[in-house]
Amino acid sequence: MATTATTTPSATSLTTLHRRIPLFPTTTTLLSLSSSSKPLFLSLSSTRSFPTHLYCIKKDDIDITFFEQDNPDEEITFDPPEKPEGYIPPRAVDEPPFESEEEIALAYEELYGAAYSGESLLGNDVYAMDSKIKKATGFGSKSKKEKIRDGFEENVVQVRRVTKVVKGGKHMRFRAIVVVGDKKGQVGVGVGKAKEVVSAVQKAAVDARRNIITVPMTKYLTFPHRNEADYGAARVMLRPAAPGTGVIAGGAVRTVLEMAGVENALGKQLGSNNALNNARATIVAVQTMRQFSDVARDRGIPMEELWK
């Protein structure tokens, strides 16, 4: 029967196989916390690193000094500087300004001129108009329009729908012809276009006020002499009439004469029946008329000698 031989490891071999490796390597220099002046360093790795110097400073070496004029126990207070001569303290938010409203208005007028009052020679918003007011109450706005009160009456001669053909289609708008006058010798014809009838009439009224002319008339409210004029294909003939005759004319010619204040006159359309051209032809015929006094002054003779 065979026997089995077993070997028992010795203590030396176990120590060699199972050697304990320390977690942190041992330092080559002992750590000392004594109050020596020699610097110490602490190394936690096997690699060489620069030492960290630790110095011990005695508390008695620190000297705390104070200025002779300062007292640490005294409370510190701040004295503001003195106010210069002529210093005016700022006013509070709720206090009124030092100047009155009249002084402020005069200073504003000296710098920027007179403020816009909203009124012009021919009414408000005709020649001068603020941009914000024009945007709020301009043409096409939904706000209520204020009628211009300047002594002129308005008469709509014609309102038609016009079409502009473009590449993308047709643009349809309304064209209005308006005659304005004060029936005292002032009359004007204007044209306006807009997407709405009301806006077109308002534009035409403003345009007519910008083209006001003076009509020469005698004391019998008629023309001083006969005259003819044409505008485009329209031709208009005007003749003076005796008192009590009235205005014998038709279409746009009659409207222009009535708004000008003519009460006795004869008018006739000889060419085209276009309302705008006939109205403008009437304006041209009236503009070329002259008073007797103007003719006598140009000739250098008294007015009584004109009929000799």
UniProtKB/Swiss-Prot annotation:
Protein source organism: Spinacia oleracea
Residue interval of the organelle targeting sequence: 1-55
InterPro entries in the record: Ribosomal_Su5_D2-typ_SF (IPR020568), Ribosomal_uS5 (IPR000851), Ribosomal_uS5_bac-type (IPR005712), Ribosomal_uS5_C (IPR005324), Ribosomal_uS5_N (IPR013810), Ribosomal_uS5_N_CS (IPR018192), Ribsml_uS5_D2-typ_fold_subgr (IPR014721)
Protein location: Plastid, Chloroplast
Domain of life assignment: Eukaryota
Highest classification ranks of the organism: Eukaryota, Viridiplantae, Streptophyta, Embryophyta, Tracheophyta
Protein name stated in the entry: Small ribosomal subunit protein uS5c
Domain S5 DRBM residues, every copy: 152-215
Signal peptide stretch: none
